[in-house]
């Protein structure tokens, strides 16, 4: 814990110094001076930040130059693993583990230049993406610890540290938010928390014996192709639902929020994306079905959790089938969700305002987003137990050696406010990913993808009247699909590191054709151990 505090102090000093950069040099804004050891680390970090664009350009040039090399692509060798090192020395059974530990760190820095917008935060509405140039960053460090509890049972603990600065206080974008690591309500002051504490029990039912390799959130083991799995505790529902080989983790692939899962999948979770609850999975060879019930936040997009799982909850069910087409692996899934939460319907908020103009965005004393538009309806006046439903489909398919395509689409009812994920009511995503075997860099990854998000007609009417939801609301709207293009190249180097350059082009930010387009340029450094 002393090490975490020491690192947190370094990050706090860096962020505090940046905030004070525009002030006279005689002020420190209350930021304490670093210790000699912290000062040395700061020098290294500053050198790294100043040289990162040059290094990235060199690596990318080397990667594409290697593509011209006609040498056969080698298979990727294993990166450094502490668990593998112990196994090599006879100190650990990595195939049937009693425990393991892994870690990761990721730093993501984004910049958007100024863009065109005829209005911003019109009439006191507050959820516009600011048209001025902005910088954003996230820094995370995570430790994954797993232990064998008894036969078939595993326990996991995952502490995490995060520091962040979003564009425009994380306002003005739907599913096109450029960095999934961003959390609602996060700050540049480093925060340490546990992201997961859960138990998993597996019951074998026969079939083929399969090997599960050691990794984060997975002990190395053997299990039956036909089995039952039960999970209980604190986790992300995306640890089990809508997982896939291509784009599940923004730390390795696409950075955009809409590529993590269905943009319209308003899965119940706190502001960090985690929940409490249970999941049950049934595997039968190439088929799987899973169900889960998890906790929502007490208020939309906030951190405190409502543990009344029989009153407010998020339910989901997913059916999965794995297949091969011409010996190329693929997968299809269908997912449905049903949430019961204390949330407002757009039509009820509009009706309340039209019946009494005093029930506007500035007068409600319950939970609200702080809009200053006295001429607009507000969801605060409409919150009561309501249900949100949606259904989606997903498919992924290898179409060649280390080349794959994927797509997903979801339709949600669009009658109630966003409670945890994005403002999308309908969403669709397609993408193409390639590993670098063809140009002799087998651990490099390149990808291009497109993401679309729509809102319902009643949602658009509410925003057009000046209302805001958890993420969007310019004060007026020319309703249109929010579109984003994401292009990235991730270069692997020195065994455990990846350096990524990413470009995103966002059209109709906040579902508003009157504003934008927006360009976002991002550099990411990621290490895993």
Give a label for each model feature.
Residues 71-72, 195-208, 517-529:
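Outer-membrane beta-barrel "beta-signal"
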Residues 172-189, 193, 208-318, 467-477:
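Surface-exposed coil loops of outer-membrane beta-barrel proteins
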Residues 97, 135-141, 190-195, 272-276, ...:
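Residues that define the transmembrane beta-barrel architecture of outer-membrane proteins
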């Amino acid at each position: 814990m002393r090490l975490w505090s020491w690192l947190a102090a370094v990050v706090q000093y860096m962020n505090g110094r940046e905030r004070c950069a525009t002030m006279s040099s005689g002020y420190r804004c209350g930021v304490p001076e670093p210790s000699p050891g912290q000062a040395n680390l700061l020098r290294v970090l500053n050198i790294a930040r100043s040289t990162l664009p040059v290094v990235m350009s060199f690596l990318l040039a080397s990667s594409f130059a290697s593509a011209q090399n006609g040498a056969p692509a080698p298979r990727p060798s294993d990166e450094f693993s502490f668990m593998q090192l112990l196994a090599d020395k006879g100190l650990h059974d990595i195939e049937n583990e009693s425990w393991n530990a892994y870690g990761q760190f990721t730093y993501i820095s984004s910049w958007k230049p100024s863009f065109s917008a005829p209005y911003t935060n019109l009439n006191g509405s507050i959820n516009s993406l600011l048209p001025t140039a902005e910088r954003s960053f996230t820094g995370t460090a995570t430790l994954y610890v797993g232990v064998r509890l008894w036969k078939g049972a595993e326990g996991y603990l995952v502490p995490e540290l995060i520091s962040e600065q979003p564009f425009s206080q994380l306002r003005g974008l739907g599913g096109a938010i450029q960095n999934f690591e961003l959390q609602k309500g996060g700050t540049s002051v480093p925060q340490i928390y546990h992201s997961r504490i859960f138990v998993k029990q597996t019951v074998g039912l026969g079939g083929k014996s399969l090997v599960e390799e050691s990794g984060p959130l997975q002990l190395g083991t053997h299990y039956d192709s036909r089995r039952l799995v039960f999970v209980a505790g604190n986790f992300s529902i995306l640890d089990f639902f809508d997982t896939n080989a291509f784009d599940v983790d923004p730390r390795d692939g696409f950075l955009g929020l809409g590529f993590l899962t269905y943009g319209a999948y308003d899965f119940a979770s706190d502001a960090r994306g985690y929940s409490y609850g249970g999941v049950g999975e049934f595997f039968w060879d190439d088929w799987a079905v899973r169900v889960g019930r998890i906790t929502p936040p007490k208020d939309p997009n906030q951190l405190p959790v409502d543990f009344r799982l029989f009153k407010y909850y998020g339910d989901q069910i997913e059916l999965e089938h794995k297949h091969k087409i011409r010996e190329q692996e693929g997968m299809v899934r269908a997912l449905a969700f049903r949430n019961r939460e204390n949330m407002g319907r757009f039509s009820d908020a509009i009706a309340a305002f039209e019946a009494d103009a005093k029930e506007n965005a500035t007068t409600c004393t319950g939970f609200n987003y702080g809009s200053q538009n006295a001429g607009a309806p507000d969801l605060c006046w409409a919150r009561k137990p309501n249900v949100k439903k949606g259904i989606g489909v997903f498919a992924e398919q290898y179409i060649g050696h280390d080349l794959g395509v994927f797509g997903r689409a979801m339709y949600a009812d669009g009658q109630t406010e966003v409670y945890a994920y994005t403002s999308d009511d309908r969403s669709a995503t397609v993408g193409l990913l390639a590993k670098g075997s063809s140009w002799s860099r087998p651990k490099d990854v390149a990808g291009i993808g497109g993401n679309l998000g729509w809102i319902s007609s009643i949602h658009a009417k509410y925003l057009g009247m000046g209302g805001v939801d958890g993420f969007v609301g310019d004060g007026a709207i020319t309703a249109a699909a929010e579109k984003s293009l994401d292009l990235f190249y991730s270069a692997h180097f020195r065994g455990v590191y990846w350096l990524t350059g990413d470009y995103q082009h966002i059209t109709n930010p906040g579902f508003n054709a009157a504003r934008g387009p927006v360009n976002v340029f991002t550099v990411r450094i990621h290490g895993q151990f």
